[in-house]
Design a protein with these regions (language model features):
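A nucleotide-sugar donor-handling region in carbohydrate enzymes
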Residues: 152-154, 159-259
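General structural signal for secondary-structure boundaries
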Residues: 74, 78-81, 229, 233-239, ...
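Charged, low-complexity surface segments at secondary-structure and domain boundaries
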Residues: 3, 47, 218-220
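Active-site and donor-binding regions of nucleotide-sugar-utilizing enzymes
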Residues: 16-192
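A short, charged/proline- and glycine-enriched loop
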Residues: 11-15, 42, 123-126, 250-259
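Short, Lys/Arg-enriched N-terminal segments with co-localized hydrophobic residues
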Residues: 1-11
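Extended, amphipathic alpha-helical scaffolds
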Residues: 259-265
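Generic detector of low-complexity/intrinsically disordered segments
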Residues: 4-5, 70, 98, 227
Length: 265
């Protein structure tokens, strides 16, 4: 983060969060509410909702009504297969030298093509938080040399699946070095050159922790929520809250119930 004096000069906006799932948005609420409790003069934040893997429907409208964020912006993020000119650079030639050269070209071209769909100037923000920087935004920020904070995609997700190591298996150390030190390719989850750090829930649970990992447990943020905080979150996430509460009240008079929660991801 930049010094607080910089904010007072009005030179930059404070924070921006890039979310790809409802869970990302939930953790963003936890982080932002915690910050508001601890720093009364922390300023306002911007929330970016990527449509890459989720249809957020009217979530942005409900969040806007809470007043927690200064802006809610939709991001029409594009996967690499949206750009047919990138296909040839993803082919496996069976040779690490040829593959790495193609990957270097792919990394630069992908970031350049993605730029047309980026809805915000990230350079205007002092702190950028990105959930799942393996998505196109990670390529974009690193190629544009814009520092950012990565945030663990799910709860202890790297413990169960270390995507960076799996997707870069075979000469991982070399690939991590090409990404972290030279920015010639991009490796997610803390190995990008412009990734300042990556927040994870529990470092001790991760078999191969990256030096950039910092531990930010999520349960204490949940435990610290006030009644008012919880109501704000409910108002943001529940689409037909009054109708749902009415159904629950009616169900209480009938007897035992089962609530089934599903997640498309």
């Amino acid at each position: 983060a930049l010094p607080s004096e910089f904010w007072k000069a009005g030179s930059m906006k404070e924070r921006i969060y890039v979310c790809h799932t409802y869970y990302h948005v939930y953790v963003t609420f936890l982080k932002e509410l915690k910050l508001r409790r601890e720093q009364k003069d922390c300023g306002e934040a911007t929330l970016v909702l990527s449509r890459l893997s989720n249809d957020f429907e009217q979530l942005d409208e409900r969040i806007r009504k809470t007043g927690l964020f200064a802006e809610i912006i939709s991001f029409d993020e594009k996967r690499d297969d949206f750009f047919p000119e990138l296909k040839k650079y993803r082919e496996d030639h069976g040779n690490i030298v040829f593959n790495m050269i193609n990957r270097m070209i792919f990394t630069r071209k992908y970031a350049r093509l993605e730029e047309a769909y980026v809805p915000v100037d990230f350079r205007e923000y002092g702190d950028i938080y990105v959930f799942c920087d393996s998505d196109p935004v990670g390529y974009y920020l690193n190629q544009k040399k814009i520092p950012y904070h990565a945030v663990e995609d799910g709860l202890n997700c790297i413990k169960n699946f270390d995507a960076a190591r799996f997707e870069n298996r075979g000469h991982f150390g070399l690939k991590a070095w090409l990404s972290r030190e030279l920015n010639l390719i991009f490796v997610q989850n803390g190995y990008g050159k412009y990734c300042l750090d990556m927040e994870v829930n529990d470092i001790s649970a991760i078999k191969y922790p990256c030096p950039q990992y910092i531990e930010v447990p999520r349960q204490p943020m949940v435990d610290a929520l006030s009644g008012e905080d919880k109501q704000l979150i409910l108002n943001a996430f529940i689409r037909n809250r009054e109708e749902l509460e009415r159904q629950i009240e009616e169900g209480n008079r009938i007897g035992k119930k089962i609530l089934i929660l599903t997640d498309p991801l």
